[in-house]
Structures are given as structure tokens and as C-alpha cells.
A protein has these predicted regions:
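Bacterial N-terminal signal peptides
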Residues: 24-36
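Short, low-complexity intrinsically disordered segments enriched in A/P/G/S/L with frequent Arg
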Residues: 6-10, 17-18, 22-25
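Non-catalytic ligand/cofactor/substrate-binding and regulatory segments of enzyme domains
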Residues: 47-57, 61, 65-178
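Activation targets extended, charge/polar-rich intrinsically disordered C-terminal tails
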Residues: 154-242
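Residue-identity detector for glycine
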Residues: 3, 14, 18, 231-233, ...
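Bacterial Sec-dependent signal peptides at the C-terminal "C-region" and cleavage site
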Residues: 35-46
Length: 242
């Protein structure tokens, strides 16, 4: 339940790099593949929580402390007993679950298709699970956390507000949930991550965000602004972007 170790992250990244070189397709396809590949928010204040932005190669996950999950999204944590932190990532269902990643399957990921969310539960700190250099923390108000969780919940396919595990994930402490939004070359794992942060009220743009680097740059900017504003009472909330 400690999440993907360094060897797993390296193996997944290496496998994806090989796919890109062999297929010469846009790096958007790697978003699906790279699924394989701290302190509690209370420290930030009783009325705030922490959002974790984790970069996993070409893919970015959005996470939070399991204790911060409220109904109905708390059902996701129930599927990962013992997890202290829960991370969500968006992907192309057909590609991610395909037995053979041949040309037709690779190409299909470019066009709108069914999505899936890989949900990972970890028992150690995110910085330990993914590497400190690959995790950005953002302080969120209660309203921001509520809006973020509402966005993630809307992304999940449920039956009568009940969330059911679709199947076990690729490593211990992970499960797949079916998603509602379509995955495509123009709406990738990283587009979804940007939409999640924007839903939480952060000033990020979402249109044209295809690659992890495009979202990572924005998350780093948010972190710098947060650090600068720490003693001034300034806010990172934004009404509009794009």
C-alpha cells in the first residue's frame, strides 16, 4: 500500500518512452501508459487542506489526504483500506486495458473514447511515494476542496450515487473506476488535471493543455505565488481563465 516504488516508476517511464519512439505518435498517448509506470493538511490551518499535484513522467495525478475526502467521494478511499493519501488520474480506457498496444490501439487513443480513472492509495507521504521533486503541494480552503472533490465525483461513472471498483489497478494499492468524460488527443490526462485545479478555483488555463509539462509549469507558478502570498493574506483564487 505504499504506492509505486522508484523501480516501478522507472520501469513504467521506460516502457512509455519506448512506445513513443516506436510509434512516433504524440506524447498524449503516453498519458495512459504512465499510469503503470508529508504532512497532514491540518498543518496549514484548521480551515484549510492540501492538494497534491504529482508528476509521474508524462502524466499528472491529483491527490489529497484520505481524511479530507468527504461523501460521496469518500467511497473511493473505502476501496483502498489503510490509505493515508488518495490520488486520481484520468486515462484512455481502451488503451490502458488493451493486451496489445499495437498501431490501431495507439491511434485509437487520439480520438474520443471511454475513459477510466486509476486511483492510487498510499500509506507513506506523497513526496516519499513519488519523489519530492515530483510533488507540488497547494493549500486549499474548504470551499476549494469541496469543489475539487465535486469535480472528481462528476468525472466518475456511478450507479445511483454508488461508486463501484471496475477492476484492480496495475500495482498494489490501486484500483480502476470507470470515467464519464471522453478521453482524446485534445482531452488528455493532463487536460483533466488542469480542469480539476480550475474547478477548485485556482488560476490555471485548460484549453490546449495536452502534455504534463504544460500543467506542471502552471502548478509551479501557483506554488511560487502561494509562497509569496503566505505572509500577505493574498489569495490564489480566480474567477476566470482561458
Amino acid at each position: 500500500m505504499e504506492g509505486p516504488d522508484a523501480r516501478s516508476r522507472h520501469n513504467y517511464a521506460g516502457r512509455d518512452a519506448g512506445v513513443v519512439i516506436a510509434a512516433t505518435l504524440p506524447a498524449v498517448i503516453i498519458c495512459a501508459v504512465l499510469f503503470f509506470g508529508s504532512c497532514s493538511a491540518a498543518n496549514a490551518g484548521s480551515d484549510s487542506s492540501t492538494i497534491y499535484v504529482a508528476r509521474r513522467g508524462w502524466h499528472i495525478d491529483i491527490g489529497m489526504a484520505a481524511a479530507d475526502l468527504s461523501p460521496p467521494l469518500a467511497q473511493a478511499a473505502a476501496a483502498l483500506p489503510g490509505a493515508r493519501f488518495v490520488f486520481f488520474g484520468f486515462a484512455d480506457k481502451h488503451y490502458l486495458l488493451a493486451k496489445n498496444h499495437d498501431g490501431p490501439v495507439l491511434l485509437s487513443a487520439l480520438f474520443p473514447g471511454a475513459s477510466i480513472l486509476l486511483t492510487t492509495g498510499i500509506t507513506n507521504a506523497p513526496a516519499e511515494a513519488f519523489g519530492a521533486a515530483h510533488v507540488i503541494t497547494l493549500i486549499a480552503t474548504q470551499d476549494q476542496m469541496r469543489e475539487l472533490q465535486a469535480f472528481i465525483w462528476r468525472s466518475l461513472r456511478t450507479q445511483d450515487d454508488v461508486l463501484e471498483v471496475y477492476r484492480d489497478g496495475p500495482y498494489e494499492g490501486s484500483v480502476y473506476f470507470l470515467g464519464k468524460p471522453k478521453y482524446s488527443a485534445l482531452h488528455t490526462c493532463n487536460t483533466w488535471g488542469a480542469e480539476a485545479l480550475r474547478a477548485a478555483g485556482f488560476h490555471v488555463h485548460t484549453v490546449g493543455v495536452i502534455f504534463a509539462g504544460q500543467l506542471w509549469v502552471q502548478a509551479r507558478r501557483l506554488k511560487r505565488l502561494e509562497d509569496r502570498a503566505a505572509g500577505t493574506g493574498a489569495s490564489l483564487l480566480s474567477g476566470t481563465s482561458d
